[in-house]
Amino acid sequence: PCQDQYIHEKYLKDIDPFFTCFLEHRRDWTDTITYMQRISPAEYGQVPPMSVQGKYIVKGERGGRISAKEEALRAFKDIGFLHDLNIVSGDAVSFRFRDENTRAWLRDVGSVLELYVYKACLDADIFNDIISSAVVRWDEVLGHASVINEIDVMATRGVVPLFISCK
């Protein structure tokens, strides 16, 4: 998920409808996002495609199978996160992600909650600064050996920090 304040400001109007989608489809949310990951795969280090065509049923965890969650896909289309959605029940699904950020959010099971908490902090109007997906590096080592933590949402009021982990 993005770290740029400008990007969040550009997407603020999308956060509540996205969270509403989550609430309406929360029972199947993990499968829905897993489906989005499987139908838009990327090799390690590669960027997932913007335009997607795939099977209606994909491989799930531990040999399971996940069917397209049609209602959730239509809800993503209704809020403008997907374009050109075409579902052939039992056979195939195709669509185009609106942009790189919505693609990232629809492929990350926790992004909806992080965005909602970020917006809640903004709406509270008591913080001087708010950032999501803040990365804290605890040493001088770069690369795989470095010690880092990702903080889902970090807000400050004066010199007092608030660290929020979304689960």
Label the model's feature ranges.
Residues P1-K167:
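Intrinsically disordered, low-complexity Ser/Thr/Pro/Gly-rich regulatory segments
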